[in-house]
Amino acid sequence: MHIDHINIRAPKDLLEQVRHFYCTVFGLEEGFRPAFSGSGYWLYAGDRPIVHLSIGGEAPEAAMPNHLDHVAFQSAGLGAFQETLHEHAVAYRSNYIPEIDMTQLFFSDPAGTGLEVNFPGERVS
């Protein structure tokens, strides 16, 4: 079993910011999305739609508690990814785990979703 995708639901204007964020920071590409009743986007990493974005209203979702802490991705190219975060003024913190030789970067998207990106075998210089 593996996680297929994450879905972020937000008002349309915020969703456009979130779409831009994932496309520019993560390099995801907007692709095919079935003709669902509501609007949204599927963002692809290669041939996999890993981030789904859907338009939601302000009222019911705002009242629902959210216990999701963060979503984690694994990547390569730590230095280039840090440069991308700097270029887009994304504040982040880093953590190195020597026992497994992995650097982690933690930050949030414009909707406030906590994100972690892991870089096995790479260390902040």
Where are these regions (language model features)?
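N-terminal beta-strand motif that seeds the catalytic metal site of vicinal oxygen chelate
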Residues: 1-19, 69-71, 125
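Core segments of cupin and vicinal oxygen chelate
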Residues: 9-50
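Exposed loop/turn and edge beta-strand positions of beta-sandwich/beta-sheet ligand-binding modules
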Residues: 37, 67, 101
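Short, conserved turn/kink motifs that form compact alpha/beta structural patches or helix kinks used as
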Residues: 50, 56-58
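Mid-chain, well-packed structural core segment of small domains
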Residues: 64-90
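Vicinal oxygen chelate
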Residues: 87-125
